[in-house]
Amino acid sequence: MKIGIVAYQGSFEEHALQTKRALDNLKIQGDIVAVKKPNDLKDVDAIIIPGGESTTIGVVAQKLGILDELKEKINSGIPTLGTCAGAIILAKDVTDAKVGKKSQPLIGSMDISVIRNYYGRQRESFEATVDLSEIGGGKTRVVFIRAPAIVKTWGDAKPLSKLNDVIIMAMERNMVATTFHPELSSTTVIHEFLIKMAKK
C-alpha cells in the first residue's frame, strides 16, 4: 500500500508518523510518500492533504500543476483525508469568517460548506474531547488550530462528528474532512479509517 501526503507545508512529518503507527496497528505493509509534483501521485492508494494555510497550499499546488491531478485522482475514488486546511481545499463552498467569500484554488469535490477561521482569534488553538464512534473510535482529545468549521453538508456528504452542534468531521464517498488535526492527537483511528478504505 502506498499513501501520499501532500507536502508543501503543514504537519507532513506528524501525518507520516501517525500513518506509520496506523499501518503498524493494522499490521499492513505500506510506504508513505511526500507528494510535491504530479508524478508523486503515481500508484498511490490513499491521499492525505494536511493542515497549513489553505490558500498557500492551493496556489502552490496549482503552480506546480498538481491541483488538477489531485482533483482527478480524488474524483476517480482514491480515499482522501483532508485535515484543517485540507478540509477547506476539498470543499465546494468556502467563506472566511472575517472577509466573507474567498477566491482561492480549491479541489472543490466535496459537498460541504466551510467557514475559515470559524472560532476567531480568541480561540487560536484549543483542545477538545470529540466523539469518533461513527468510525469505530470512542471519545478522544483532539487539537484545533485556527480551525475552520463545516457549516453545511448536502448531496452524499454526511456529518461524522460534531462539537457543540458544529460539524468537525464529514464524509462523502471516498473523502473524509476534519476541521481538527488528527495527526496531533493520541489516537490513530482516523488514519486507520483511511487505510481501511484504501484496502477495500
From Swiss-Prot:
Cited PROSITE patterns: PDXT_SNO_1, PDXT_SNO_2
CDD domains given in the database record: GATase1_PB (cd01749)
Catalytic activity: aldehydo-D-ribose 5-phosphate + D-glyceraldehyde 3-phosphate + L-glutamine = pyridoxal 5'-phosphate + L-glutamate + phosphate + 3 H2O + H(+); L-glutamine + H2O = L-glutamate + NH4(+)
One CC-aspect GO term: cytosol
Pfam family, one: SNO
Keyword terms, alphabetized: Glutamine amidotransferase, Hydrolase, Lyase, Pyridoxal phosphate
Active site: 84 (nucleophile), 181 (charge relay system), 183 (charge relay system)
Family listed: Belongs to the glutaminase PdxT/SNO family.
Function: Catalyzes the hydrolysis of glutamine to glutamate and ammonia as part of the biosynthesis of pyridoxal 5'-phosphate. The resulting ammonia molecule is channeled to the active site of PdxS.
The protein's name in its UniProt record: Pyridoxal 5'-phosphate synthase subunit PdxT
Organism from which the protein derives: Sulfurisphaera tokodaii (strain DSM 16993 / JCM 10545 / NBRC 100140 / 7)
